[in-house]
């Protein structure tokens, strides 16, 4: 069991109820003054809107849950998430098992690198948890158009642990990559269209960063765009890519880079299939390596098989 405060509990509860491996998500109030409060009193009693998350550790780890949690909050915002303001909307991770603190600290340390501002998420033992009123439970299931400050759909995307795919040193990168791979990933060059290794390949599997091995795209989201480069409707997870404005060649485009390796991957455009979200990730074959579905388990990517099937 872990207790997560991430702003309005309606969205947090609904998000975690959709995460594979979560057994139950319950809205409530935690770590205020005293063990009695309600929705009308929490701004006076100092409790935080919190979700009790029960999970099967054989299906999802605490670290994976916390990576999901950081996906849906702004950890640098004090007493504010989305449009909600007040101490009851502060972020926090409250634990009942002291052994969990080491994992929480590990995630904090890793996530601190992603932000210029200080992380202000509370981490503390759970003092008390008071279940919220019945009308708050499963609120968004009962009120599908109700207020929610987070993107619930992201719950279905896999969490990919960046620490498993560290970036090699500059010397190691140069030794590992071919001259062409180096020019594309490190010097932002573009390979030739229609003569690269993956533009017309549609076998089942995943595509990973050629530098770090971090998973980036799934064959399930690959489509024939006619542009001569591999095209995808979305990344395998929203967490694994970064975006940058690119004004080279007298154009304004959105560059796509890998998260861990900071490799130049390509660009994203808005002329993709409408029924798949309307985006086209135009990616250099030299920036990625294909892992066939049959090899994913042996190469450590078995946890992503459901993203291919």
Curated annotation (Swiss-Prot):
Region (Peptide methionine sulfoxide reductase A) location: 1-153
Record-annotated MsrB domain positions: 170-293
Record keywords: Multifunctional enzyme, Oxidoreductase
Enzyme class: oxidoreductase
Residues at the active site: 8, 282 (nucleophile)
GO cellular component, one term: cytoplasm
Catalyzed chemical reaction(s): L-methionyl-[protein] + [thioredoxin]-disulfide + H2O = L-methionyl-(S)-S-oxide-[protein] + [thioredoxin]-dithiol; [thioredoxin]-disulfide + L-methionine + H2O = L-methionine (S)-S-oxide + [thioredoxin]-dithiol; L-methionyl-[protein] + [thioredoxin]-disulfide + H2O = L-methionyl-(R)-S-oxide-[protein] + [thioredoxin]-dithiol
Enzyme Commission number, as recorded: 1.8.4.11, 1.8.4.12
Annotated Gene3D superfamilies: Peptide methionine sulfoxide reductase, Peptide methionine sulphoxide reductase MsrA
Top-level taxon of the source organism: Bacteria
Pfam families: PMSR, SelR
InterPro entries (UniProt xref): Met_Sox_Rdtase_MsrA_dom, Met_Sox_Rdtase_MsrA_sf, Met_Sox_Rdtase_MsrB, Met_Sox_Rdtase_MsrB_dom, Mss4-like_sf
GO MF annotation: an example: peptide-methionine (R)-S-oxide reductase activity
GO terms, biological process: protein modification process; protein repair; response to oxidative stress
Record-annotated disulphide pairs: none
Biological role stated in the UniProt entry: Has an important function as a repair enzyme for proteins that have been inactivated by oxidation. Catalyzes the reversible oxidation-reduction of methionine sulfoxide in proteins to methionine.
HAMAP family attached to this UniProt entry: MsrA, MsrB
Family assignment from sequence similarity: In the N-terminal section; belongs to the MsrA Met sulfoxide reductase family.
Protein name, UniProt field: Peptide methionine sulfoxide reductase MsrA/MsrB
Species annotation: Streptococcus pyogenes serotype M1
Lineage: Bacteria, Bacillati, Bacillota, Bacilli, Lactobacillales
């Amino acid at each position: 069991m872990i207790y997560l405060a991430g702003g309005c509990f309606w969205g947090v509860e609904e998000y975690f109820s959709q995460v594979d491996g979560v057994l139950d998500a319950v809205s409530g109030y935690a770590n205020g003054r005293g063990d009695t409060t309600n929705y009308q009193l929490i701004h006076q009693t100092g409790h935080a809107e919190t979700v009790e998350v029960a999970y099967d550790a054989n299906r999802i780890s605490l670290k994976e849950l916390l990576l999901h949690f950081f996906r849906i909050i702004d950890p640098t915002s004090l007493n504010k998430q989305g449009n909600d303001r007040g101490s009851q909307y502060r972020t926090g991770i409250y634990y009942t098992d002291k052994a969990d603190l080491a994992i929480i600290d590990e995630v904090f340390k890793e996530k601190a690198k992603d932000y210029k501002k200080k992380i202000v998420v509370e981490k503390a033992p759970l003092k008390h948890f008071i279940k919220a009123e019945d009308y708050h439970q499963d609120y968004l299931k009962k009120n599908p158009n109700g207020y929610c400050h987070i993107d619930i759909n992201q719950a279905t995307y896999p969490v990919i642990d960046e620490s498993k795919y560290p970036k090699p040193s500059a010397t190691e990168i140069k030794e590992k990559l071919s001259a062409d791979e180096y020019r594309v990933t490190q010097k932002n060059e573009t390979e030739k269209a229609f003569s690269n290794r993956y533009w017309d390949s549609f076998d089942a599997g995943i595509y990973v960063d050629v530098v770090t091995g971090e998973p980036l795209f799934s064959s399930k989201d690959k489509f024939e765009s006619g542009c001569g480069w591999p095209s995808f409707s979305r990344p395998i997870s929203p967490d694994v890519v970064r975006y940058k404005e690119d004004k080279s060649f007298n154009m304004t485009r959105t560059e796509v880079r890998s998260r861990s390796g900071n490799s130049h991957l390509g660009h994203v455009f808005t002329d993709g299939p409408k029924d798949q979200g309307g985006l086209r990730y135009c990616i250099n074959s030299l920036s990625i390596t294909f892992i066939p579905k049959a090899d994913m388990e042996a190469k450590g990517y078995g946890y992503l098989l459901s993203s291919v099937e």
